[in-house]
Amino acid sequence: MKTFGKKVVLIGDGSVGSSYAFAMVTQGVADEFVIIDIAKDKVKADVQDLNHGTVHSPSPVDVKAGEYEDCKDADLVVITAGAPQKPGETRLQLVEKNTKIMKSIVKSVMDSGFDGYFLIAANPVDILTRFVKEYTGLPAERVIGSGTVLDSARLQYLISQELGVAPSSVDASIIGEHGDTELAVWSQANVAGISVYDTLKEQTGSEAKAEEIYVNTRDAAYEIIQAKGSTYYGIALALMRISKAILNNENNVLNVSIQLDGQYGGHKGVYLGVPTLVNQHGAVKIYEMPLSAEEQALFDKSVKTLEDTFDSIKYLLED
């Protein structure tokens, strides 16, 4: 591979993409930030708007409009482009149309001579990330999905509101599909080593509060989409966080979507959100959280759902 740097190419300048661009500029994560979209006037305006704010960025960043040839020397290509999720539509129902869009985009990226890392956010993210990996033949650690990073943040926030602590003080994870079969790993959730599940049960006298928090976490996107059309701030910040871990070689453990190779019950091939070490070499090490028997069964169900869905679009891997 080429010398590692901090050039990022964003493909997709919709609500998620533009919010991600804003987050990257305000955090000063990239040295060069290129935006690609078929809506070229929108890109031109966003580039102008963002560059007007770079004087306030913590480090210099050059924001520009680009084309696919700009991917040739990119360190990180982030794809948010795709058909949006409609009110009442599940992420998995998006699968065929967004896989076709993804195939076209990725072919153009690879034709440029791209030799960096992919970060996928378009939905259904686990399916599309696996598709990109299998279509390109790149090593799994270089094809990463946003996974359940956002879902875990939602869970941490909701728990923090119940317990009166900062969200960053909550150690809790959502794993599995970024979607309806995701699961909260209550057996490991804690604040300062104290079980969140037990604390919630003690405070309320029942197990209902934990279930309520899980459901509100799982269904948050549906509620937001119903009210304002799409979710974008939360996922944009999650993408910035993953990008920062890669570009700054942070060695952070994040619940990205990555390909299993025998972990969590022997599953192989499937992409889904699990705790993974992320640095400048990509998603390099999966951490296996101890799961209860019930949690393992839910995880297995999530795997099957994703496997069955991927089987339905496998034919698109053929040129």
Curated annotation (Swiss-Prot):
Pathway: Fermentation; pyruvate fermentation to lactate; (S)-lactate from pyruvate: step 1/1
The family this protein is said to belong to: Belongs to the LDH/MDH superfamily. LDH family.
NCBIfam families: L-LDH-NAD (TIGR01771), PRK00066.1 (NF000824)
Positions with a binding annotation for substrate: 85, 91, 123-126, 151-154, 231
A single GO BP: lactate metabolic process
Role: Catalyzes the conversion of lactate to pyruvate (Potential). Contributes to S.aureus growth during nitrosative stress in both aerobically and anaerobically cultured cells, despite playing a secondary role in this resistance mechanism.
UniProt protein name: L-lactate dehydrogenase 2
SUPFAM superfamilies linked: LDH C-terminal domain-like, NAD(P)-binding Rossmann-fold domains
CDD domains documented for this protein: HicDH_like
Pfam families: Ldh_1_C, Ldh_1_N
Recorded GO CC terms: cytoplasm
Keyword Cytoplasm belongs to the record: yes
Modified residues (Phosphotyrosine): 222
Catalytic residues (positions): 178
Entry annotated with the keyword Cytoplasm: yes
EC number: 1.1.1.27
UniProt entry keywords in alphabetical sequence: Cytoplasm, NAD, Oxidoreductase, Phosphoprotein, Stress response
Binding site for NAD(+): 16, 37, 42, 68, 82-83, 104, 121-123, 146
PANTHER family in UniProt: L-2-HYDROXYCARBOXYLATE DEHYDROGENASE (NAD(P)(+)), L-LACTATE DEHYDROGENASE
Annotated GO MF terms: L-lactate dehydrogenase activity
Catalytic activity: (S)-lactate + NAD(+) = pyruvate + NADH + H(+)
